[in-house]
Amino acid sequence: MAFCTKLGGHWKQGVNVPVSSMLGSLRYMSTKLYIGGLSPGTDEHSLKDAFSSFNGVTEARVMTNKVTGRSRGYGFVNFISEDSANSAISAMNGQELNGFNISVNVAKDWPSLPLSLDESIEEAEKKENKMMSRSVWKDPFVDAFLMKKKNAALNRKIWSRRSTILPEYVDSAVRIYNGKTHVRCKITEGKVGHKFGEFAFTRKVKKHAKAK
């Protein structure tokens, strides 16, 4: 009898641990918000200020490209309570921030992200060192090599005229289909937020008069 009781206790403990862990993760995720559509000029300080009117903001993070250091156009805001997070979603989703309309939703993948700046830097260094060990023999300038790979990937993709240019495309050369042909275009910071079609001009062919 004592053996059965002890065994039952272990079984109950084994079941409760995963369930409580899962519930904790769901609660953790519901207080973290994903902020999309950020302008290139929005940093972590201005992002936190934008949500400071909602009580309980503990952290604001803007995700950046580790090669260029530029914003990827999205970030995360952490709240103490679910009520504050829900209020922020209702009030801020679709609103304008630094000239860009932002989207605000519950962060689905937040638990997989680093929990602190130190962890984020450590993880980035590990990935960078691993990538350098594979790439340094191909090109001694690793940053230039990574940028070349990024540009090559973007060049292979043909962008629609209706697509919006995001901050992560800056310094990349892309191909845009203008309805007749594919136009190469260099993306600069001034083009962020515009449609690809604004820069996919159709070349007019001049017809020469036939000699009589």
From Swiss-Prot:
InterPro entries, A to Z: Nucleotide-bd_a/b_plait_sf, RBD_domain_sf, Ribosomal_uS19, Ribosomal_uS19_bac-type, Ribosomal_uS19_CS, Ribosomal_uS19_SF, RRM2_NsCP33-like, RRM_dom
Task: List where in the cell it is found.
Answer: Mitochondrion
Q: Does the keyword Ribosomal protein apply?
A: yes
- Looking at the record, the residues that make up the RRM domain are 31-109
State one molecular function term (GO). structural constituent of ribosome
Listed GO biological process terms: translation
A Pfam cross-reference name: RRM_1
Principal localization reads mitochondrion
A GO cellular-component term linked to this record: mitochondrial small ribosomal subunit
Note the NCBIfam families from the entry. rpsS_bact
Tell me how this protein assembles: Component of the mitochondrial ribosome small subunit.
Q: What does this protein do?
A: The RNA-binding domain found in RPS19 may functionally replace the missing mitochondrial RPS13.
Q: What is this protein called?
A: Small ribosomal subunit protein uS19m
- Which organism encodes this protein? Arabidopsis thaliana (Mouse-ear cress)
Q: Lineage in the entry?
A: Eukaryota, Viridiplantae, Streptophyta, Embryophyta, Tracheophyta
